[in-house]
Every structure is written in C-alpha cells, then in structure tokens.
Amino acid sequence: MTDELSGRRVAILATDGVERVELEQPRGALHGAGARTELLSLHTGEINARQKDIAPAGTFSVDKRVADASVDDYDALLLPGGTVNPDQLRTDPDAVAFVREFMGTGKPVATICRGPWTLAEAGVLRGRRLTSWPGIRTDLRNAGADVVDEEVVVDGQLVSGRGPDDLPAFCAAVVEEVVRALRRS
C-alpha cells in the first residue's frame, strides 16, 4: 500500500448491471494507492452488480447521483463495464454530460470492457486510440476511434482495458496514469 494518491478523489460512474470485478478491482487499486473513491450513479441507494453479465453479484452503495456531481470535485474518472451498466449510462443525459465534461478537463479517464460505450455517446472518441471488449469495437470505430486489440492502451488522459482478464494490467495502468497526471498538474 502506498499513499501516492492520498487526498485525491476518483469518481466511479456506474449503475445497475455493472460487472462486479471491473468496479471492485480498480477501486481496490486506487484505495491501495491512497485515493478516495465515490460511486456516482443514476439513482441513490444501491446498484446491483453482475458476474459475467448473468449471475447476481451483490450490490454497491451509491455515494451520489451523477446529476448532483461536479467534475471539479474529482481528480479522475473510472467507467467500469458490464453490458447493462454502460447501456443505461449512455441513454442518461446527466451521465453523458458528466463524461463529456470530464473528458474536456484533461483529467484521467479510465474505462474497461464495454465502458467506452458511454464515451462514444458523449462524442469524445474521434481520433482517440483505445481498446475494449470485442463486441463494441465497431461502435467505437463508428464514433471515430482507433480501436486496437491490446491488454491496456493509454492515449493521453484516456486509459482503456479489454476486459476482466486484463484487470491486473489495467489496474496498474490506472494508478500509474493518475499519479503521472497529478505530478504534471
């Protein structure tokens, strides 16, 4: 455990249907580096997690509705995947606006699996290089992204990972890039 991110806040934007490990493991890595995380969602209370999109996998307590959140309060943003989670986020105007505004700040944004769907909806992928779950790559290319099949891709402020099998490398890259961005600021 280190304290490189002590005092820093990371927003995690997710809703019902989030892939449990894609929220839990990056959050754990950020906590291990000293960061504080807040779970933003479409509603208050709890969100239901899934395992491999099918099996119920417990719940996570929501800290704040995304409609009530400000990008100024956070040093980085994490967009975990699952199928249902980003599918709901990309149809919510508040979630899409939050993601678009966050990308506009230049602060780190990390996304894995199907999480980039929300970035595509926000219109912020044109000319960006990233990776994702294979099933959404055509959507990302249609949004103007250069999509590659790699474990983890870092393109400026954007850190992306393919899926659950790549979580160790993704988590390490997320912490590294947030630390690097904070050193530059």
Q: Where are the regions a protein language model picked out?
A:
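Catalytic nucleophile serine of serine hydrolases
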Residues: 113
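Extended, subdomain-level signal for the structured scaffold at the beginning of enzyme domains
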Residues: 1-105, 109, 117-129, 137-185
